[in-house]
Amino acid sequence: MWTLRTMQGREPVLTFRLLPGTIKTLGRAVRADFIVDAAMVSRLHCRLTTQSTGQLDVEDLQSTNGTYVNGKRVQKATLLPGDTLRVGRVDLVLAHAPFNQSATTLEGGT
């Protein structure tokens, strides 16, 4: 399972969880799976795809301000644990943990 967190100081502000084999959109629109209501974030900014193998890919959805991985603008990229995904002025830090199907998990923002 992948976790994306925005941080304010040392405290997480938003946390998103992605289970294996899912596709989620991130943006400021209500129809986005993960809503980030911040300046410079497009309505549908990027798509996150978790493969059944555990790999996480990001694809920019023609956002106005671009999608960045570790400071580099990307159209598509494979993400790794510890990477920073930037949408608008929001940085999301990525973490990966093995998925335990017996554990209760939440998808979406908290």
Residue spans of the language-model regions?
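Regulatory inter-domain linker segments that are low-complexity and enriched
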Residues: 1-4, 89-110
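Short polybasic amphipathic segments
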Residues: 2-7, 65-67
